[in-house]
Amino acid sequence: MAEHSNTAIAQLAWDAVSRSDGETLGQILAPDIVWHATGNTPWRGDHNGLDAVLDYLARVGELTDVFDARLTDVLASESRVLIVFQVKVEHTGRKMELGYLVLARIEDGRAREVWTSPLDPDALARFWAH
């Protein structure tokens, strides 16, 4: 069975984020993208437009001492892609490992809207409460 085109888009986006490759992300993310970051974190909220999303993605890594994300799975359909990943975070001597989901709505080969969600929102809230 051939790889779904949205799976390839997700993998390309994952690789671009890992390399801080804004140019490639600019080809994958729609100019008017809306990114919904859920969970009780310093970067929670809606990020509107490509520049705001690129800034958000940069800030995620800047606010932590260690941010190591490992891709677990990619699931795709004609209009959506779901990325499942594990993240290890260290901040001010504290450590946490957590599963995350990224769901993207794809139109015309570009991500138009994205939602991120931690699999254990309570653990995430406790980590950032200190």
Residue ranges and their predicted role:
Residues 1-130:
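C-terminal and inter-domain tail/linker signature
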